[in-house]
Amino acid sequence: MASHLELNNGTKMPTLGLGTWKSPPGQVTEAVKVAIDMGYRHIDCAQVYQNEKEVGVALQEKLKEQVVKRQDLFIVSKLWCTFHDQSMVKGACQKTLSDLQLDYLDLYLIHWPTGFKPGPDYFPLDASGNVIPSDTDFVDTWTAMEQLVDEGLVKAIGVSNFNPLQIERILNKPGLKYKPAVNQIECHPYLTQEKLIEYCHCKGIVVTAYSPLGSPDRPWAKPEDPSLLEDPRIKEIAAKYNKTTAQVLIRFPIQRNLVVIPKSVTPARIAENFKVFDFELSNEDMATLLSYNRNWRVCALMSCAKHKDYPFHAEV
C-alpha cells in the first residue's frame, strides 16, 4: 500500500500522521519530537486544540537539528468556527503559522461547516447550551481560503466534517478556483462512512480518518459506550496477524485508500502505531471490519445540532 496519496494539487500527503487533538500542551512537544525521530512526517494540528505553540517548539527543534527538512514535513492545521467571516480567515491562519513557527502550511482545512459567533470563546453558547451561530456561509469562507493559496500561506486547502451536499455547494461555487483537496472525517469500524468516502473519491478528494481508535480518551466518554480497542472480534483479527488491535484499526483505513491520524503522547504507542506497513489485512477481514458499522460517532458536536450547517442530520 502507498505510504503517500496524491492530492489534486499534485503534492503527496503521507498516509499516516500524528494526531494532536487532546494532546496536553506539556506532553505534545515531546510526542512530536519522538514521532519525527521515528519517521512520522505528517502532523495534524488545529488552533482549537490550544497546543500549536508547543507543536511549533518540537518542529523547530527537529528542523534545527536537521533531522528533517521543511519540505519533507506535511503540516496540517484547521480554521476554527469563530473565524468563518471572510475578513478573519487570513488572521487565523497567520496566528497558526506564528504559533507553529512556519512560513506555510501544507494543508489548511475548514474545521467544521458551522460558523460560530466571533469572540474569545471557541464555543459561544446561549442560555440553553446551544452554540451561537455566526451570520456566515462556508461557501464565502472558502473564497477566503482560496486567497491563502494565492498568497503562499498554504499549499492546499480542504474541509473537515462536511457532508456530500456541503462539499457539492463548494464544488458548484461560481468562480471556484481550487477544489477541496481533502475532507477529514471521523472514521473507524463503528462509523465506516462508505457513502461519504465513495462520494469524495469520486470527486478526487482525499479522505483523512480521524479518531481511528474511537478516541478512548475523549472527555465525554460514557461507561456504556462501545470500545473499539476492547472489541473481542477486533482483538481476534489482530491476534491472527500477530499485531495489536490499534495496529489493525490503523491499517484498516490505509487499505481503504484513506489517510489516518492516530493520536498518542506515549512514545511506545507512537512507535506501535507507525508499524502498520509490514502486513496486509485479507479482503475477508476488511469486509468483516466494515460489517461492524453502527453509525456511532465519537464527535457528534451535539451543541450545534440546531445550526443551519450542522453536517450530521442527513445520512446522504
Curated annotation (Swiss-Prot):
The modification N6-acetyllysine is found at K95, K222, K263. Its EC number is 1.1.1.21, 1.1.1.300, 1.1.1.372, 1.1.1.54. Keywords: Acetylation, Cytoplasm, Lipid metabolism, NADP, Oxidoreductase, Phosphoprotein. Transmembrane segments: none annotated. The record marks K78 as: Lowers pKa of active site Tyr. Catalyzes the NADPH-dependent reduction of a wide variety of carbonyl-containing compounds to their corresponding alcohols with a broad range of catalytic efficiencies. Catalyzes the NADPH-dependent reduction of a wide variety of carbonyl-containing compounds to their corresponding alcohols. Displays enzymatic activity towards endogenous metabolites such as aromatic and aliphatic aldehydes, ketones, monosacharides, bile acids and xenobiotics substrates. Key enzyme in the polyol pathway, catalyzes reduction of glucose to sorbitol during hyperglycemia. Reduces steroids and their derivatives and prostaglandins. Displays low enzymatic activity toward all-trans-retinal, 9-cis-retinal, and 13-cis-retinal. This is Aldo-keto reductase family 1 member B1. It comes from Rattus norvegicus (Rat).
